[in-house]
A protein has these predicted regions:
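Carbohydrate-active catalytic/glycan-binding domains of CAZyme proteins
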Residues: 1-316
Length: 316
């Protein structure tokens, strides 16, 4: 059993851990929302004390200059990519929304901590609206792009969309909507589906996602599909009617979510998520820095479904 210190890394929200070859890589939102930094270690535990290396800083102005959110690091065909959301302003639009779009930077060098990063620009989608929290994965021999975006035609902040990719920064074909906020637990504070993450187990592909406002209402939902089914057919997807990971008042863990998944060297699945240990937030929760990174093993039920359990209490 892995009993990681809790919190695992303080003041890092939207945590993402990549296991690649003999190393683990960690990237997340920083409280200042002004840079992209990577940690690398030979073990999961080693990430806690690994030195963060800043690989990109937001420019003074322009579309990638403000509020750098939820980066993910991916190795694709021998190159490194970071996907992240950014905007040109802190101002909200006419709908009261932040004005983020998704962007990609690329490193063709073997070492993403010392290599040169180039900006590949915005990931264009069919509508030019608030977009964030993209991830990418291989499934059925194709590369996919999975993200959250505001629809001009649907009430709420963001829905989840899936599209095939022509290359790591360009979509191919028409995206499909996989989920929108519909249950009450997805609509507390704001109507939100965001932060999707992919987990494959047995004959199913799972997508976890986060819902509601980023306070104690924040929680995780779950979609799944048979691995052989066509992911571009929305009717092939199933959606859990209840959250699969949520606030534990008993353990003083509030608003767990915006997760990713990694694995131990033994192949155990690990849930990587953030949560706060208090509810008294002054002002916008986004500017409260104490969403801490936490780790928890994923249990698997006999029916092949994941059991995320309850957010464990702080140990530190």
């Amino acid at each position: 059993m892995n009993n990681w210190p809790n919190p695992f890394i303080e003041q890092r929200a939207d945590p993402f851990i990549l296991r690649h070859l003999n190393h683990y890589y960690f990237i997340a939102s920083v409280p200042e929302y002004d840079r992209l930094e990577i940690r690398r270690a030979a073990t999961l535990e080693g990430l806690r004390d690994a030195e963060p290396v800043v690989v990109w800083r937001a420019p003074q102005s322009g579309p990638m200059s403000q509020l750098i959110w939820a980066p993910e690091l991916h190795e694709i065909d021998g190159k490194w990519y970071i996907y992240f959301a950014a905007t040109y302003t802190h101002d909200l639009d006419a709908l009261g929304m932040f004005q983020h779009r998704m962007f990609v930077i690329e490193c063709a060098d073997s070492d993403p901590l010392t290599g040169r990063w180039q900006e590949k620009g915005q990931v264009e989608t069919p509508f030019d609206t608030f977009a964030l929290d993209a991830t990418t994965f291989i499934h059925q021999g194709k590369r996919w792009y999975l993200w959250a975006q505001k629809s001009p035609h649907i009430e709420g902040n963001s829905n989840l969309y899936l599209a095939e990719m022509a290359n790591p920064w360009t979509l191919k074909g028409e995206p499909v909507m996989l989920s929108k906020p519909e249950f009450d637990w997805e609509c507390r504070g704001f109507k939100v589906n965001e932060g999707p993450a992919v987990l494959v187990h047995g004959d199913k592909l799972f997508i976890s996602y986060s819902a509601s406002a980023t306070d104690e209402n924040y929680c995780m939902g779950l979609l799944w599909i048979d691995r052989e089914a066509d992911p571009l057919q929305p009717e092939n997807w199933h959606k859990a009617p209840q959250p699969v990971f949520r606030t534990s008042y008993e353990n003083r863990q509030y608003g767990p979510g915006h997760n990713s998944f990694t694995q131990t060297p033994a192949g155990e699945d690990v849930l990587v998520y953030h949560a706060r240990n208090y509810t008294e937030i002054e002002g916008d929760p986004l500017y409260d820095p104490n969403r801490h990174t936490r780790l928890k093993l994923v249990a698997w039920r006999e029916d092949g479904m994941p059991d995320f359990g309850i957010p464990p209490a702080d140990t530190l």
